[in-house]
Amino acid sequence: MVTPSQHALLAEGVAHLTDARTAPALCALLKQYLEELILFNTRAHLVHVTHTEELITHHLLDSLSAWPHFTNARAIADIGSGAGLPGIPLACALALYAPETELTLIERREKRIAFLENACARLALPHLRIVHADAHDLTPYTYDAITFRALCPLNHPTVYMLLNKLRPGGVILAYKGKRKLIEQETRDFLPQSCSVFPLHVPFLHEARHLVAIHTPCAAPPQ
């Protein structure tokens, strides 16, 4: 279960990233998700962490930190969602700020799907759904935004494949770390196709960025 000090850490982080009007409701949703994550992580090893506080800072708050960049999208896919990161924290925020947004968790591993089904059933968010599939099998031109955290480097062929799953004007929003590594991974992209936004994650003293990739970005690697 979530201890009072862990709850306080989560609540303070959420307050930094949102506003006083919605922070309590959002914190309540994230606490439910955190409880499911703690319960399943001990036996399913969904996320490698050493303590619950790390789950809060490095995963929940990190995922939540980019939510304002998703409010204009009406159909979002979280690719390789795994433990529901970043998709579930984003869905919790968007349920309050952009309630018509549909967010789909895409996951191909059976054990991860079982966890996602439990977590989503508990949260009961009407526009959050799960698809048990490989990203390659998704229908083209379906999403306004596609996101991922630890899927692959930005210059990997998978990224070019995902661009084909976007609607016209759509964007890939990828969570990344140091700016230098981002520059290395995007050096072959067209300059106008890629934007980098710093993310400020409460209590996390590491460089975090959100990379926006629009189509066309570059010729696919051979």
From Swiss-Prot:
Sample GO molecular function, one term: rRNA (guanine-N7-)-methyltransferase activity
Family matches, as CDD domains: AdoMet_MTases (cd02440)
Class in the EC hierarchy, top level: transferase
Major subcellular site: cytoplasm
EC numbers for this chain: 2.1.1.-
GO CC aspect terms: cytosol
Residues binding S-adenosyl-L-methionine, per UniProt: G80, L85, R149
Compartment annotation: Cytoplasm
Keyword list, A-Z: Cytoplasm, Methyltransferase, rRNA processing, S-adenosyl-L-methionine, Transferase
Homology family: Belongs to the methyltransferase superfamily. RNA methyltransferase RsmG family.
The protein's role, per its UniProt record: Specifically methylates the N7 position of a guanine in 16S rRNA.
Listed name of the protein: Ribosomal RNA small subunit methyltransferase G
